[in-house]
């Protein structure tokens, strides 16, 4: 596969993909590029709206029916449920790590398996999260790039 980048200051940014057929890898790139235009609406502690790029999300957590979006420098509430966010941002590197948790695997710094089957992930901001044993096998498949069936 060839990659060619042409810089032109006069034209609006545009990405053109030429291919014989759309393979799963190419479709993933297309989906990822298209998802960049979708931002997640959040509300901060002062009830001010702000928007988060899906790539900037470290993890998403549901606590007592409220969904929180965590980035490296902000936390916000969203009206969307975990399931809605998981369905809408399937192309982002999000993984459902527990019933109440979605983690962005692009921000994982390290992993540590536990004897009880759980996996402790350390994010690049040094925060630690737990992948439940129920999701651990699927998590390993996702990291290997294998197809897996969502629970």
Where are these regions (language model features)?
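…primarily DNA-binding HTH/wHTH and HhH modules…
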Residues: 148-151
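N-terminal regulatory/sensing modules of transcriptional regulators
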Residues: 1-27
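Active-site-adjacent beta-strand anchor residues
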Residues: 19, 129-132
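C-terminal structural segments of small proteins and small subunits
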Residues: 133, 137-138
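Conserved binding/recognition cores within well-folded domains
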Residues: 25-130
